[in-house]
Amino acid sequence: ITRKPQACPPIWLMRQAGRYHEHYQRLKEEHTFEELCKKPRLAAETAMGPINDFDFDVAILFSDILFPLEALGMDLSYNPGPQFGLHLDENNAESLLVNENPINFMEFQGEAIERTIERLPGDKSLIGFVGGPWTLIAYACNISKDSRNINLNNFQIGLLDNVILPLLKENIKLQLKAGAEIVMIFDSTAHQLAEEDLNFYLGKTFDALTKEFPNKVGYYAKDGINYETIIEKQNNPEISLAGLGVDSNIDLRDYFTKTSSGFVQGNFSEHFLTLPHEDFLPELDVFINQMLELDPEERAGWVCGLGHGVLKTTPQENPVSYTHLTLPTTVFV
C-alpha cells in the first residue's frame, strides 16, 4: 500500500481456498458451501487450508459476495451455484427487500475473520471482501452476463444509492473492525456498464465506500473494463483507494508508472494455472522474466497474484510451484 520497494512481493490468489484444493474437497464431503461460509469455525478452517499448504502471505475471508442480498431479504440458495427464488424488479422490490437491519445478518463474517486471524502466524494478515455494487445489482436483477454498454436506469440508481451502497459500507466497516487489513471490492461485472455510466458509477461507489476508510479498500474489475477510468480515481488523494486489481488481458508492467499510490495486484493468467504441470512452468517463467525487467523500485506496490480466481480444474501442484518459484527473494533480487 505504501509502495515500498520489495525484492520479494507478497502473494495471494483470489479463490485460493476452493474446489481445486484437496483440503477444501475434504471439508465439502461433510459440509455444504453455506455451512463453510456461515459457521465461523468452518470458515476459518477453510481459509487456513491454503495458508498451511501453500504458505500464501495473506488469508482471505472465506465467504461469498452475494450474502448481502440474502441479508436484505432475497431468497438465496446454492445448488451448487447461486440461485434466487425471485429476482428484483421495480414491481417486487418492496416485498423482497424486507429486512430492516440487514447488517446484523452479516455478523458471521466478523466472527469468521476473528477466528481466522487467531490461527494466522504473526507475519501474515487477512483480507476481507465485498461484491461490487453493480455486480450485486446485476445478480439481483438477473442481468445477462453477456450484456454490454448498459446505461443505468432510475430504478438501478435508486437501488445503488438507497440500498446497496449503505449496506456495503456497513459490511466493510464490520470486516475492518473484526481485523481485516484490507477489504477488496470484487466488481466482476462492472465492465457491463457504458463508459459514461461507469465513470458516474465509480464516483458514487468510491465516494460511499472508500473515503470513510482511507487506504483500507481496494477495487478489482475485469474483462475489458477501462482501467484508465479506475486509475484516474486511484490517483485522486481524496478517494484514498488502497489499490487496484487487474486481469490478465493487460501488461501489468505498464500500471506501476500509471498509478501514483496504492498497490497493483495481479496478474498471471488463471487459465495458465490449469495447464498440465510441464506446460504451466514455461508460462510461469515468462511471467517471472517479464516482472524481472522491472527493478524493485519500478515494481513497488506489486501484490503478486492472478488475473482472476483459481479455477476448479487447477492441478494442486501448480499453486505450490507458483508460490515457491515466484516468492523466493533470490528470484526477484
PLM-predicted stretches and their roles:
Residues 1-9, 113-115:
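N-terminal amphipathic alpha-helix/helix-capping segment at the start of soluble metabolic enzymes
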Residues 5-34, 65, 72-78, 127-158, ...:
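N-terminal small/glycine-rich loop or linker at the start of catalytic domains
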Residues 10, 51, 116, 175, ...:
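Conserved, mostly hydrophobic/aromatic
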Residues 62-74, 183-197:
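Glycine-rich, proline-tolerant flexible connector loops at the mouths of alpha/beta enzymes
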Residues 77-174:
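Active-site-proximal, glycine-rich beta->alpha crossover segments in alpha/beta enzymes
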Residues 109-121, 198-215:
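Alpha-helix-loop-beta-strand connector modules within alpha/beta enzyme cores
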Residues 216-223, 240-250:
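Catalytic beta/alpha-barrel core
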Residues 323-329:
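Conserved small/polar residues in nucleotide/adenosyl-binding loops
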